[in-house]
UniProtKB/Swiss-Prot annotation:
Location relative to the cell: Cytoplasm
Domain notes: Consists of three domains; the N-terminal catalytic domain, the editing domain and the C-terminal C-Ala domain. The editing domain removes incorrectly charged amino acids, while the C-Ala domain, along with tRNA(Ala), serves as a bridge to cooperatively bring together the editing and aminoacylation centers thus stimulating deacylation of misacylated tRNAs.
GO annotation, biological process: alanyl-tRNA aminoacylation
The encoding gene: alaS
Reported cofactor(s): Zn(2+)
Organism: Thermotoga maritima (strain ATCC 43589 / DSM 3109 / JCM 10099 / NBRC 100826 / MSB8)
Protein name: Alanine--tRNA ligase
Residues engaged in binding Zn(2+): H561, H565, C663, H667
UniProt lineage: Bacteria, Thermotogati, Thermotogota, Thermotogae, Thermotogales
Length: 863
């Protein structure tokens, strides 16, 4: 076998299958269009709707090199030669086209003829009941029977993903590395019993059955092929190394880690583990952030934060005490940027986000480690509640707590940890309110298989359609005469909520009836559902209707959507190319735009952005819409979002010279129709993500009117001109502060302060006040001693269900009495603490109701 680089292997695979009639598609995003998955975990994920029969394939033969991310075995990453978080999966797919024979023959041809792998190095396994696959391997390929293993369902049968669905047998191809640890002598060593000698390099899945609710298998009318081969494993095979980390995919990254840490690879096994963890994790981190995932405490952001913190923890084990991961990003970009240009474009952003997260975690880790040590010192172990507190308060992932505990030889009981997590999530959901999430809309199965709603809303705001389906409470009905129902029409001008743009609303009318359209959504690919409230009449399946979109609402939404594109372009121009969309809301009354940036915008920057957007509006630039292939659109420099799903033909919305984005939303004909653009707020959403809210058109006009009314009211109240308002308000604020101080002191001076004389003749002055802030009590105590000359002053103030306390001792009594000691004694009784100097001390407590008891026993606390 000749040495091949990762680039050569990747290119050879795709070219081979292109010659076999496959359409070569670019890698889909790591963020799948699947609510059940956080990440793309396999090459077949982008094609799930096809495998499930929900979408007709554009191409029947496809091949890809797909970016994937898995964290299910993250604890093994770095400890084994082949566990990874981020990896690339080579795959060829057939959707009702070729089947087992071609899939097996082509896999064998690629391995033995293109890559030049010696035949004697290859073994396979097949499902024990799959005689067809066995026969192809044995008779067509000529593989000896002894190198074809028959395995059970657990090893060689894929799916279904749930209780029901597509499934089928698979065949796995193994490469013999010759590494013989733990393997029986002689010919007894096989992929079934070796410990690491045989590496699975390719899995061919034959999706030919459908499993029903009873577990019975039914032949599929259209059989599919789904194959997956890890590029990292192919590289190890073709580069003659046992570990994936010794391939050209990882070595440049490992060299960079060696430079930064001063620790050589393969000099110490424990340190080697840490180097491998960092080398693996930095790839995942770079790709995730470049695709718009940012560290947070939930969902994808939490997974990213967990990966970052695990990598940092291993950096600390290598002696790193400051941020360092962001300095390895360039090694990843240099190695993989030609294949995945998104990491080149996002390099600056990745470094900024990562550096900020590293700094944050170092502070958190310092605090968390102190708490960890305190808990261990007190209890000798970490229990579930402690582990959850370390996570919830100090941001230490459970996995990191377990690793630290293991290193310190400390027991960790995490049996109840998940219960605490579930309770927190329950509270979070309750705080958010009821959210409709991942409804199945099973009633849509009653629609014809290839049904798609014809959307006419780009050209029309009114159209005629036919009722195709009516559903109430997730059940189809023939007719409905009152209440809220969900309806599918044959065609509609109503825009379904998508891509951040809210849905249209309006009316549906038919002979003797009408209904209010409250919400419109796309429940499955191309099927638009209208949630309507029937006002009059009876709506029946098959009925002809007129659908009318609320024109003013649509036009306002269009203004805001086009303005969002202009805002995105302006932010890039003012702040830099690292700015990327991280979320949006386009509604008729406002727009909201989340974007990547690492600090708040200054007033000058906000003005620059506003000025740019309004300049483009005043230029009345025509907004152009065209349809093209995804590949051509990306080549032309269009902005595409990784969180959006795009088909083979895409819609490009362009404001010439300003903005060019893939977008399915509704837009104005030219920018002048937006009227006016005004930012109303700018704030942080999460680490590295900012949010701008803005208004346009009549909403902007209303904002200006309201501000003018407010200014006029202030002018009238303050008796000042507009240019005098700021100075007048500042002056009034200072006067209020001074008056509050005088008022407080004046009120207190009128209060009766009692005096108690001790046996030694010392006078103790004490008083209890309501609502006096603690900061004023010291001044009152000073006034009392000035007036009385000498003594001890003890003053209490009840404030917001708490109690504040000051103690003042005159100079001549300091040899006998200590204000700090007195304050601590009293505070302990009041459920608090305090302290200070011998002559003056302050304290606080949680039980103001105990003040009376303290005063009755005052002499006890003076000792």
């Amino acid at each position: 076998m000749r040495y091949m680089t990762s680039e050569e292997i990747r290119e050879a695979f795709l070219k081979f299958f292109e010659k076999k009639g496959h359409k070569i598609l670019p890698s889909a995003s790591l963020i799948p269009d699947d609510p059940q998955l956080l990440f793309t975990v396999a090459g077949m994920v982008p094609f799930k709707p096809i495998f499930w029969g929900k979408v007709e394939p554009v191409y029947t033969r496809v091949a890809t090199c797909q970016k994937c991310l898995r964290t299910v075995d993250i604890e093994n990453v770095g400890k084994t030669p082949r566990h990874h978080t981020f990896f690339e999966m080579l795959g060829n797919f057939s959707f009702g086209d070729y089947f087992k024979e071609e899939a097996i023959e082509w896999a064998w041809e690629f391995l033995t003829q293109v890559l030049g792998v010696p035949e004697e190095k290859l073994w396979v396994s097949v499902y024990e009941e799959d005689e067809e696959a066995f026969r192809i391997w044995n008779e067509k390929i000529g593989l000896p029977e002894k190198r074809i293993l028959r395995m059970g369902k657990e090893d060689n049968f894929w799916g279904p993903a749930g209780p029901t669905g597509p499934c089928g047998p698979d065949t796995e191809i193994f490469y013999d590395t010759g590494y013989s640890k733990g393997c029986p002598e002689g010919e007894g060593c096989t992929p079934a019993n070796s410990e690491g000698r045989f590496v699975e390099i390719w899995n061919l899945v034959f999706t030919e059955y459908y499993q029903d609710e009873e577990g019975k298998l039914h032949p599929l009318p259209r059989k599919n092929i789904d194959t997956g081969a890890g590029l990292e494993r192919f590289c190890a095979m073709m580069q003659g190394v046992y570990s994936n980390f010794d391939t050209d995919l990882f070595q440049p990254i490992i060299k960079r880690i060696e430079e930064l840490t001063g620790v050589g690879y393969k000099t110490d096994e424990e340190k080697d583990v840490s180097i491998r963890v960092i080398a693996d994790h930095i790839r995942a981190i770079t790709f995730l952030i470049s695709e718009g995932v940012f560290p947070s405490n939930e969902g994808r952001g939490y997974v990213l934060r967990r990966i970052i913190r695990r990598a940092m923890r291993h950096g600390i084990l290598l002696g790193m005490s400051e941020p360092f991961l962001y300095r390895i990003v360039d090694a990843v970009v240099e190695k993989m940027g030609k294949v995945y240009p998104e990491i080149v474009r996002g390099e600056g952003m990745v470094k900024e986000v990562l550096s900020a997260e590293e700094n944050r975690f170092l502070k958190t880790l310092e605090q968390g480690m102190k708490v960890f040590d305190e808990i261990v010192e007190k209890k000798g172990k970490i229990d579930s509640e402690d582990a959850f507190r370390l996570y919830d308060t100090y941001g230490l992932p459970l996995e990191l707590t377990l690793e630290i505990a293991k290193e310190k030889g400390v027991e960790v009981d995490v049996q109840e940890f998940n219960k605490y997590m579930e309770e927190q999530q329950r509270k979070s959901r309750a705080a958010m309110g009821d959210v409709e999430f991942a409804r199945r809309y099973e009633y849509l199965e009653k629609l014809p298989k290839d049904f798609r709603t014809e959307f006419t809303g780009y050209e029309k705001l009114e159209d005629e359609g036919e009722v195709v389906l009516v559903a109430r409470d997730d059940e189809t009905v023939e007719e409905a005469s009152e209440g809220t129902v969900e309806v599918v029409f044959s065609r509609t001008p109503f825009y379904a909520e998508k891509g951040g743009q809210v849905s249209d609303t309006g009316m549906v009318e038919w002979r003797d009836g009408k209904a209010l359209v409250e919400y419109v959504f796309e429940a499955s690919e191309g099927v638009i559902v209208h949630r309507i409230k029937i006002l009059d009449g009876t709506l029946r399946r098959g009925q002809k209707v007129i659908l009318r979109v609320d024109k003013k609402r649509r036009e306002a939404t269009m203004r805001n959507h086009t303005a969002t594109h202009l805002l995105h372009a302006a932010l890039k121009k003012v702040l830099g190319d690292h700015v990327r969309q991280a979320g949006s809301l386009v509604a008729p009354d406002r727009l909201r735009f989340d974007f990547t940036h690492f600090k708040g915008l200054s007033s000058a920057e906000i003005e620059q952005v506003e000025d740019l957007v309004n300049e483009w509006i005043m230029e009345a630039i025509p907004v152009e819409v065209r349809y093209t292939s995804y590949e051509e659109a990306v080549k032309s420099g269009v902005v595409a979002l990784f969180t959006e799903k795009y088909g083979d033909v895409v819609r490009v919305v362009e404001v010439p010279g300003v903005s060019k984005e893939l977008c399915g939303g509704t837009h104005v004909k030219n920018t002048g129709q937006i009227g006016l653009f005004k930012i109303i707020s700018e704030e942080s959403v999460s680490s590295g993500v900012r949010r701008i809210e803005a208004v346009t058109g009549f909403s902007a006009l209303e904002l200006l009117r309201n501000q003018k009314k407010l200014i006029d009211q202030l002018k009238e109240i303050l008796g000042a001109r507009e240019d005098e308002l700021t100075d007048r308000v500042l002056s009034l604020r200072e006067k209020v502060k001074e008056l509050e101080k005088k008022l407080s002191q004046g009120r207190i001076s009128e209060e009766r302060i009692a005096m108690k004389q001790l046996e030694d003749g010392v006078k103790v002055f004490h008083g209890v006040f309501e609502g006096v802030e603690a900061k004023h009590l010291g001044g009152i105590a000073d006034n009392v001693l000035k007036k009385e000359g000498e003594g001890i002053v003890i003053l209490f103030s009840k404030f917001e269900n708490k109690v504040s306390l000051v103690v003042k001792v005159s100079e001549n009594l300091l040899g006998k009495y200590d204000a700090s000691s007195i304050a601590r004694n009293i505070a302990k009784e009041l459920g608090g603490n305090g302290g200070g100097r011998k002559n003056f001390a302050q304290a606080g407590g949680r039980h103001p109701e105990r003040i009376k008891d303290v005063l009755e026993r005052l002499e006890e606390f003076l000792r």
